[in-house]
A protein has these predicted regions:
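Low-complexity, intrinsically disordered regions enriched in charged/polar residues
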Residues: 5-9, 243, 421
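N-terminal leader/targeting pre-sequences
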Residues: 364-503
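Gram-negative bacterial Sec-dependent N-terminal signal peptides
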Residues: 2-20
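Generic low-polarity alpha-helical segments
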Residues: 1, 15, 28, 484-485
Length: 503
């Protein structure tokens, strides 16, 4: 009798637990799927480009649980014998929420990670510089946008072996699927055209003009009616009909370094959340009339974004702050942040990523399953050097401290040197500029060029450099202090500083 009662309770628990991850009424699921309340079984995963890690966060208390270390920082990753991953960047997950696919751009790899054990179960190497990967709605295939070439690599959803390639315009940026499972939408990072592909036979059935070439991210509404994509080079976000003839519906001026977009359904309606890296904000738009309804300050260089299984929160990776921010979608304000690795890029929220512990009982038949301490944290490592970075701002000379600085800078520790990443805004479009070190805070004195760059049509740029820069700009170890500045022109012919360092 006792055994029968135990089995009955276990069966009920198993059935309810299975129902939780059968689907969700949030992206990338269908509107008809049930919402999944936030629980300790859920995970937020962020892909970190410079530490080559995946950080794992518990969304209930916004606590970093640890990292999955896929590779090493400099200088180890420069070795000819290096076998780890490089430039960990893109991310997707399977329909059963038991596998995440993590793309490493520099090593041309897709890493398939078991969410229960945090262990890599397979690595598939594809073509040059893949950017993002996602599973089809039935989980039978994984489509990888190979941005350094002109095709989508289609992998078997079970063996992860490449089964075919779909030729698309040069530089595919990302693929997302219609929640009804019919179409794959592929935007481009090098060609001003998005294509629509039938999942069943891999045929292009629609073409949508992009306002500019650089699309990094794309999202579909749960009702399969709209597709939103960002344009990082021009600071725009575009919307087209998710069904034939795939007509363009709207072009929005969202702001410099428009990064990622995702869709949220909650008690107030359905909304698109767009991360604006150059403004350090998330902008919120209604999907029915495209009205902007909120602007949410987030922190430095918001990038990846994904909703919780019930739409009550969205999570945002802060690329130049090495944090994940949690946003309450009913209040549209940041309610918590947690530390992650260096330069988080793509981010996903996976409901029920960790199965309930064996024998766990769904107390009072609620949706909050019991997850014992330490369950689902195997193989995770502490941040270590992945958590070491410094940040500063650049602003026009004479700007007051209370004025918003247009440029954020992050210095990610890599041994004795750092990777510098500057999210530059507030400059003239399409002009050459120089990031330099000056002997004077005003940007005068002796100048040492660091990196030249060209601004995009939105007057913005992402600028990178490597060196012992933190030690120099802080005057550490008795090193004569220098100051980061931006000047118009080139190393050989430049004007006076237009932005100078501000702590």
């Amino acid at each position: 009798m006792k055994r029968s009662a135990y089995l009955a309770v276990l069966l009920v628990s198993t059935v309810l637990g299975g129902a939780r991850y059968a689907g969700a009424g949030q992206a990338p699921g269908a509107a008809s799927d049930p919402d999944i309340p936030i629980s300790h079984q859920d995970r937020v995963y962020s892909a970190e480009q410079y530490s080559n890690t995946v950080s794992v966060t518990d969304p209930v208390d916004n606590k970093l649980l640890g990292t999955i270390r896929l590779g090493d920082p400099l200088p180890a990753n420069l070795s000819p014998l290096y076998k780890g991953q490089l430039l960990v960047h893109g991310m997707g997950f399977s329909p059963d929420h038991r596998t995440i696919a993590v793309v490493a751009i520099g090593s041309n790899a897709v890493n398939f990670i078991d969410t229960a054990t945090n262990s890599v179960k397979h690595v598939t190497y594809v073509g040059r510089s893949p950017h993002e990967a996602f599973f089809t709605r039935d989980g039978s295939e994984v489509w990888v946008s190979v941005r350094g070439e002109n095709y989508v690599s289609v992998l078997d959803g079970t063996t992860y072996a490449e089964k075919t390639r779909i030729t698309v315009p040069n530089g595919p940026g990302m693929t997302i699927f219609s929640p009804d499972g019919k179409y794959g939408y592929v935007c481009s990072s090098f060609t001003p055209e998005t294509v629509v592909i039938t999942v069943a036979d891999h045929k292009i059935v629609g073409r949508v003009p992009q306002a500019s070439p650089f699309c990094p991210n794309i999202a579909a509404t749960p009702d399969s009616k709209q597709v939103w994509f960002t344009l990082k080079d021009t600071g725009k976000t575009q919307v087209f009909d998710g069904q034939p003839p795939f007509a363009l519906l709207k072009t929005l001026d969202t702001g410099p370094i428009s990064n990622h977009v995702n869709i949220v359904r909650n008690a107030n309606g359905m909304f698109a959340y767009v991360t604006i890296g150059g403004l350090n904000e998330v902008k919120v738009f209604r999907t029915d009339n495209f009205e902007q309804v909120a602007t949410i300050p987030t922190g430095k260089l918001p990038h990846g974004i994904w909703p919780s299984g019930d739409g009550t929160r969205v999570y945002v990776g802060l690329e130049n702050e090495d944090k994940v921010a949690a946003i309450d979608t009913l209040k549209n304000e940041v309610i918590a942040t947690s530390p992650v690795g260096q330069a988080p890029q793509a981010l996903v929220y996976v409901p029920d990523a960790v199965p309930a512990a064996s024998g766990a009982i769904n107390s009072a038949m609620t949706r909050m399953m019991v997850v014992p301490e330490g369950h689902g944290t195997s193989n995770l490592q502490p941040l270590g050097v992945a958590g070491q970075s410094a940040q500063l701002w650049l602003a026009p000379p004479g700007a007051k401290k209370e004025e918003k600085a247009p440029t954020s800078v992050s210095l990610s520790d890599q041994g004795l040197v750092q990777v510098l990443e500057a999210a530059v805004t507030g400059l003239e479009p399409g002009k050459p500029y120089l990031l330099a070190l000056a002997t004077e805070p005003s940007g005068t004195g002796v100048l040492e060029p660091v990196q030249g760059f060209m601004t995009n049509p939105a007057g913005a740029a992402i600028v990178n450099a490597i060196g012992p820069i933190r030690q120099v700009v802080r005057g550490e170890d008795k090193i004569p202090r220098r100051y980061l500045v931006i000047l118009p022109g080139t190393p050989d012919n430049h004007g006076a500083a237009v932005q100078v360092q501000r702590e």
